[in-house]
């Protein structure tokens, strides 16, 4: 129980604090100073900086102590591991708070998916807050596993762990005043909750209208000019450094003393190998400092700025009364984590976790999510009225695409992969309602010359997507995905040669992040070296985004090939 009298006595040095970090270099995010001294902690609260004695004392030998890092916007599902395993990985990188949008699992499992994520993240040495997914489904051009309306979200909106409404991707719906979109915005407003934005290239009067609807943040800026305009409008900007979308090196050049307090960091979508190799928020801080940002400012963007944006009281700074969420760093250049303290407890030290992540939650309601009609080679037959057709041309080292016209070779009006070198067939198979809906299209530049690959990670509705150079291997891959209940797989010469099961909603594995990263890396190597995939293509990431019908120019869903520019099926 909090006793103010006793805390004051300990702050005065009359009584010993429970924990004192001795000989620290303390990063003060308020004054931009590095302060030498002892840091006194009692329970979960910082009680003072100065000269203190404690029941437990740790000599830090001039190491740096910073506020624990905050990820202001993340989709855990993109790590392909369970929330507990994700927590284990990012705690070791100095992260003590994350703000999660469970958008991916919500598109598969609806409210059951959100509830699973909330249950799974209880009682961990990591604070996990939620933004309720605002766009389920993301569009009407694909079949999702759920539809969430304002009435559905009302069940959880007043939870202490729910900070507001997740990224409002449907900015056209905001501007056109769609009833259901406005209902969700009104719901968040009625509970005084925050609304996250998703508004790439939205500027001028449209941005004014978007902000007027109550939207406070954005993580989609691609230029300094766009970032500054949104800051002028009162928005907080989360600079994103994900696996596919990386904006830090561009945007950080526009950060200065005038705008820095409105800027945060976020991972958004970050894959397991990137977290293990490069890090999490520590990577953002490190890259910011490398790009010339003053070290206390970089740490401020990874801590107090996000805390203030999301109304997290007593979080994000090292000062009396603030929560003792701390990261001990070897230096302020490499930002190497030595120790992590969460709520006054040492939870990670010398590359070892000192507190477990708790027992795993029941996955019954978020497993066995592949529900399809039997798929045969006949189902994947592509009949064309003409030998000139639209093809999805994938870009190298990017998730962007071009809509190109190509002449193809047909056999009795049917596309045959063996007659069209350099062009792969792609199909999206609805996996939620057993509708039998299948969209089929063609892809160039992917480079796959043998076999097929398939996945249940296919943004945003996460149907099965399969790409190959022959129908037999494509069907084999789809059947394997159904057999394991979701995941990613490779087939070749009529045989399955590698599979990673993603038993949680077809999106996440219960295995360790190290296991998942190693398996994904192995499968990528097989794609490049055995199947012939272009080495400038990340096969499974590129495959996953081929199904997202909101990114220009051309995509594929279970309903067909979609022209994003002209907003129509081809």
Swiss-Prot record:
Protein's UniProt keywords contain Transport: no
Cofactor(s) recorded in Swiss-Prot or TrEMBL: Mn(2+)
Assigned EC number: 3.5.4.2
SUPFAM superfamilies per record: Composite domain of metallo-dependent hydrolases, Metallo-dependent hydrolases
Reaction(s) this enzyme catalyzes, per UniProt: adenine + H2O + H(+) = hypoxanthine + NH4(+)
InterPro entries registered for this protein in UniProt: Adenine_deam (IPR006679), Adenine_deam_C (IPR026912), Amidohydro-rel (IPR006680), Metal-dep_hydrolase_composite (IPR011059), Metal_Hydrolase (IPR032466)
Broad class of enzyme this protein falls into: hydrolase
One annotated GO molecular function: adenine deaminase activity
Keywords: Hydrolase, Manganese
Gene Ontology biological-process annotations: adenine catabolic process
Family under the similarity heading: Belongs to the metallo-dependent hydrolases superfamily. Adenine deaminase family.
PANTHER family registered for this protein in UniProt: ADENINE DEAMINASE, N-ACETYLGLUCOSAMINE-6-PHOSPHATE DEACETYLASE
Protein name according to UniProt: Adenine deaminase
Source organism of this protein record: Clostridium acetobutylicum (strain ATCC 824 / DSM 792 / JCM 1419 / IAM 19013 / LMG 5710 / NBRC 13948 / NRRL B-527 / VKM B-1787 / 2291 / W)
Gene name per UniProt: ade
């Amino acid at each position: 129980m909090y006793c103010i009298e006793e805390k004051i006595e300990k702050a005065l040095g009359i009584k010993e604090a429970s924990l004192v970090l001795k000989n620290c270099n303390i990063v003060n995010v308020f004054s931009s100073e590095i302060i030498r001294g002892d840091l006194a902690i009692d329970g979960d609260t910082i009680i003072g900086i100065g000269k203190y004695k404690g029941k437990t004392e740790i000599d830090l030998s001039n190491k740096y102590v910073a506020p624990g890092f905050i990820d202001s916007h993340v989709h855990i599902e993109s790590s392909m591991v369970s929330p507990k395993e994700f927590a284990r990985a990012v705690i070791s990188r100095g992260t003590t708070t994350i703000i999660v949008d469970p958008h991916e699992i919500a598109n598969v499992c609806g409210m059951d998916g959100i509830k699973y994520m909330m249950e799974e993240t209880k009682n961990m040495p990591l604070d996990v807050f939620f933004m309720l997914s605002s766009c389920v489904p993301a569009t009407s051009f694909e079949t999702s596993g759920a539809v969430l309306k304002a009435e559905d979200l009302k069940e959880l909106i007043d939870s202490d762990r729910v900070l507001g409404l997740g990224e409002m991707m449907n900015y056209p719906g905001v501007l056109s005043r769609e009833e259901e979109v406005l209902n969700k915005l009104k719901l968040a407003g009625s509970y005084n909750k925050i609304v996250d934005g998703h508004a790439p290239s939205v500027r001028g009067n449209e941005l004014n209208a978007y902000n007027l609807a109550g939207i406070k943040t954005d993580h989609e800026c691609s230029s300094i000019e766009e970032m500054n305009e949104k800051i002028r409008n009162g928005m907080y900007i989360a600079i994103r450094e994900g696996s596919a979308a990386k904006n830090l090196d561009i945007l950080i050049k526009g950060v200065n003393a005038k705008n820095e307090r409105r800027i945060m960091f976020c991972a958004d979508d970050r894959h397991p190998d990137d977290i293990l190799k490069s890090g999490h928020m520590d990577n953002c801080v490190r890259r910011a400092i490398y790009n010339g940002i003053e070290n206390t400012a970089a740490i401020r963007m990874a801590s107090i700025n996000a805390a203030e944006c999301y109304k997290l009281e007593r979080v994000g700074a090292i000062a009396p009364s603030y929560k003792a969420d701390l990261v001990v760093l070897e230096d302020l250049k490499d930002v190497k984590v030595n120790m992590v303290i969460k709520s006054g407890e040492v939870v990670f030290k010398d590359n070892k976790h000192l507190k477990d992540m708790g027992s795993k939650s029941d996955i019954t309601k978020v497993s066995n999510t592949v529900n399809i009609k039997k798929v045969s080679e006949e189902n994947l037959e592509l009949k064309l009225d003409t030998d000139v057709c639209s093809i999805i041309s994938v870009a190298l080292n990017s998730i962007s695409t071009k809509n190109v016209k190509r002449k193809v070779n047909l056999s009795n009006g049917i596309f045959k992969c063996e007659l069209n070198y350099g062009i792969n067939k792609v199909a999206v198979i609805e996996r939620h309602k057993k509708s039998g809906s299948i969209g089929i299209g063609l892809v160039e530049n992917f480079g796959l010359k043998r076999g097929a690959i398939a996945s249940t990670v296919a943004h945003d509705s996460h149907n099965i997507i399969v790409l190959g150079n022959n129908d037999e291997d494509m069907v084999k891959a789809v059947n394997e995905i159904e057999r394991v209940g979701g995941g990613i797989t490779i087939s070749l010469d009529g045989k399955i040669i590698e599979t990673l099961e993603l038993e949680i909603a077809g999106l996440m594995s219960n295995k360790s992040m190290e296991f998942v990263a190693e398996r994904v890396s192995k499968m990528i190597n097989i794609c490049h070296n055995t199947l012939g995939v272009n080495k400038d293509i990340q096969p499974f990431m590129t495959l996953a985004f081929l199904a997202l019908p909101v990114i220009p120019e051309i995509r594929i869903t279970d309903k067909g090939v979609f022209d994003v520019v002209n907003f129509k099926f081809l």
